[in-house]
Amino acid sequence: MSAKPTLSKPIGSGEASSPAVVFRRLWPYIKPLIWVLIGAIVAMAVSAATDAAIPALLKPLLDKGFGAHANDRAKWFVPAAVIGLALIRSLSQYASGYLLAYVTNKILLDLRLKMFDRMIHTSVAFFQRETASTVINAIVFEVNQILNVLLSVLVTLVRDSLTVVFLLGYLFYLNWRLTLIVAVLLPAIGWLVGKINRRLRRLNREHQLLTNELSYIVEESVGGYKVVKVHNGEQYEMDRFESMSKRLRGYAMRMTVSGGLAQPLTQFLASIALAVVITIAVVQSSSDQTTVGGFVAFVTSMLLIISPLKHLMDVNQPLQRGMTACEMIFGLIDEPSEPEGGGKPLERAHGAVEFRDVSFVYSGNATHNRHTLDQISFRVAPGEMIALAGPSGSGKTTLVNLLPRFFDPTGGQILVDGVAIPEYDLHALRSQIAMVSQDVVLFNDTVANNVAYGQTADAGKVKAALRAANLWDTVEAMPKGIETLVGDNGMMLSGGQRQRLAIARAIYKDAPILILDEATSALDSESERHVQAALETLMKGRTTLVIAHRLSTIERADRILVMEAGRIVESGSHRELLAQDGLYAHLHRIQFQQSAA
C-alpha cells in the first residue's frame, strides 16, 4: 500500500515536536487567559501544600500527644487542623478544576475555529492531497487530544509537581541526610523517562497514521456502499478493516508495553530507597538523632511522594499522544491559505475571457514533464457560448477549473475583461462565475438554502430559479416546499432532481460567466428539453463555457474547441467541424452509432 499524504507532520514549519515547541505554539491561545490560568495554578498550589501539611501534623501529635508528657493542646489542635486542611483542599481542588476547564474549553474552541477557518480557505490542492477522514480526525477528534492534555496532563504536571516539591522541602527540613538518598533517584528516573519518551513519540505518530488509514477505509466503505454491495465486496472490505484494526492493536500493545515500564521501574527504585531510609533511621534513633514522630513523619512523607511521582510517570503516555495530536493540529493551521488576489474590485464583469498561452501541470506530473494543458490560447467574447469537446482526459475540466482560480496556470495568462485574473480580488472574481459540475454537491439543508447558497435566500427568486430548472412542481409537492430538507448530499432527491437543483443554484446566482460541466447528463429526455431551454435563456448575454461528453448538447454552441492531450486540435462550429472530418467528426460518428444501436 502506497503511503498517503497526511496532516501529521512536524509542527512549527519543520521544528521537531517537543513540550517547549508545543507550548510556544499554544501560547497565543493561552495568553488572553493567563490570569485565569494563574488562578488555577494558585489553587493547585494550595491543594499541593495541604498534602505536605498532613505529615507535618503527625510529628507534634506523636511527640507531644501521646505518653506521660502528652500536651492537651496537641490532642485537640491536630484533629481540628486536619478538618481545616480537608476543607481548604476541597475548595482549592474545585476552584482549580473549574478554572482549568474554562481555560481548556476556550482554547479548544479557538483551535477548532482556527482549524476550520484554515481548512475552508486553503487551496484546492489541499483537498486533493488529504482524505476527508484525515481532515475530520484533525478538526473533530485530534483537537480533543489537546483538551485531554490541557486538562489531565496540566493538572498532573502542576499539582503533583508542586506536591513533590513541598514534600521534598519538608523532607529536607526533617532530615537532609536521608532526603539526599531519595534525591539520588531523580536523575535515574529522569533518564528512564526520557528513554521511554522517544520510543512512545515514534509509536504515537505511527499509530496516528494507521488511525487515519482505518478512518479512510470506513469512509470509502460508507461512501461506496452501492459498489460494495453490487460487487459482493463485503468480505473484501471486512478483510481490509480487520487487517488495519489488527495493526492498530499491535501498535497499541507496543505503546502499552513501553508506557507501562515507567511506573513499575520507578516504584522498584523507590522501594530500594525506602529500605535504605528505614535502615539508616533505625540506626539514628538508637543514638537519639531522631524521634518517633520525626521518623513517622519522614516515612509518611516518603510514602506520600510516591503517588504524585507515579502520576508524573503515568502522564508520559497521554502527553506523547497529545504531542502527536499537536503535530496534526498545527500542521493544518500552518497550511497556506489561497492567495487573495491583487485586490482589484469587480462589480459585474462584461464577460470577455481570454486564455493566452496557458499551460498547466499537476505537481505529481512535474517530474515526468507531462503537461495537462499545453499552450492553450483562445478568446471568448461577452455573451458567447464556447463548447469544449474531446476524449476523456484531454484537459477540459482542468481548463475550466483555472478560470475561478482553483489552480493557477504554470505558464501563460488568463484574462477577464482584459485584466489578468490574479489582479482581481479572489472573492470578487468568483462572484462573477456560476458553475454546475457533473459531480453534484448538495448540503444537508433546505431547498431554498441550497439554491441560494452563499447568498441570502429570497423566496421569490428561489421559486423562479426552480421553475427555470424544471424543478418547481417537484418542490411544490414537498411537505414544506422550499423549506424542505434535502438530506445528506440531497439523498431525498433523485439523481435528475439533484442535478436540476444544482442548475437552479447557478440560475439563482445570475453570474455573467457560466461553467457547465455536463450539466444535463443526469436528466431524462423530457426534463432535459425543459432545462436546456431554460439554460439557453439564461445564457443569453452571458459568457458560457460548456463541457459535454454527449456532443448533441453542444451542437448549437457559437464555437466548439476540440481538445486532445492538453491541446486545442480543432476549432469551429458544429457544421464546420463535421466538414473537416477530424477528431470531432470521429467522436460524433461514434456517439450516433451507439445511439442508433
Swiss-Prot record:
The chain crosses the membrane at residues 26-46, 76-96, 138-158, 164-184, 263-283, 292-312. SMART domains: AAA. Pfam families: ABC_membrane (PF00664), ABC_tran (PF00005). Keywords: ATP-binding, Cell inner membrane, Cell membrane, Lipid transport, Membrane, Nucleotide-binding, Translocase, Transmembrane, Transmembrane helix, Transport. Residues 38-321 form the ABC transmembrane type-1 domain. PROSITE patterns: ABC_TM1F, ABC_TRANSPORTER_1, ABC_TRANSPORTER_2, MSBA. One of its GO terms (cellular component) is plasma membrane. GO terms for molecular function: ABC-type oligopeptide transporter activity; ATP binding; ATP hydrolysis activity; ATPase-coupled lipid transmembrane transporter activity. NCBIfam families: MsbA_lipidA. Belongs to the ABC transporter superfamily. Lipid exporter (TC 3.A.1.106) family. In MsbA the ATP-binding domain (NBD) and the transmembrane domain (TMD) are fused. This is ATP-dependent lipid A-core flippase. The lineage of its organism: Bacteria, Pseudomonadati, Pseudomonadota, Betaproteobacteria, Burkholderiales.
